[in-house]
A protein has these predicted regions:
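Glycine-rich phosphate/ribose-binding loops and adjacent secondary-structure elements
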Residues: 35-189
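Short glycine/proline- and acidic residue-enriched helix-loop micro-motifs
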Residues: 26-34
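Flexible glycine-/small-residue-enriched beta->alpha junction loops
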Residues: 1-26
Length: 189
């Protein structure tokens, strides 16, 4: 959820999830809206470098939805200053998101995918790093046309989940977080 982080309700926490996430059974698992390891663009890039090193050189990057354009430009400036570039950036549109997000946030926080993707692509071209950073696109991609459009706007690949959610029966009841999904897509009991 934009600006809110994520919440996995206690009812959905299995012993396996509790062990992996380090949370007690019977308690909501709250993921903060920001990462505790960094708070600046330079810190973000240093975290990307640490992840790449810890994984033995596997690709490392980050996902974002463009809010204020100057914030991404600060990341671009940090890339130039540090020489650290992510292997990839996934641009999410405000149209994406979760059924647990408040409607006001889903409709009014962040840039639409087309605008955000075009901005990120053009910014990376402008600073001369587009050839070093791959761009993924996500957010309400449901058709072949949606895929072709984001590829034409500069994406190297796209993530498409919504169409698959519909295929397995999602009716967008926006109750994913309640543990009472009417079609069972977000509830496996």
């Amino acid at each position: 959820k934009p600006g809110h982080g994520g919440v996995l309700p206690a009812a959905k926490i299995t012993p396996e999830i509790a062990a992996i996430r380090g949370v007690p059974m019977g308690q909501d698992c709250v993921s903060p809206a920001r990462h505790s390891c960094f708070s600046t663009p330079v810190g973000l890039l240093e975290q990307v470098a640490r992840m790449r090193e810890a994984s033995g050189g596997k690709p490392a990057g980050f996902k974002l939805c463009i809010g204020h354009q100057w914030e991404f430009m600060a990341i671009c400036k940090a890339m130039l200053a540090t020489g650290i570039t992510p292997d990839f950036i996934v641009v999410d549109g405000k149209e994406g998101g979760t059924g647990a997000a408040p409607l006001e946030f889903m409709d009014h926080v962040g840039m639409p995918l087309r605008d955000g993707l075009s901005f990120v692509h053009n910014a990376l071209v402008g600073i001369g790093l587009r050839d070093r950073v791959r761009i993924g696109a996500s957010g309400k991609i449901t058709s072949a046309f949606d895929m072709a459009r984001v590829l034409a706007l500069g994406a190297d690949w796209c993530n498409a989940a919504r169409g698959f959610m519909f295929a397995v029966g999602c009716i967008q009841a926006q109750s994913c977080h309640t543990g009472e999904c009417p079609t069972g897509v977000a509830t496996q009991d």
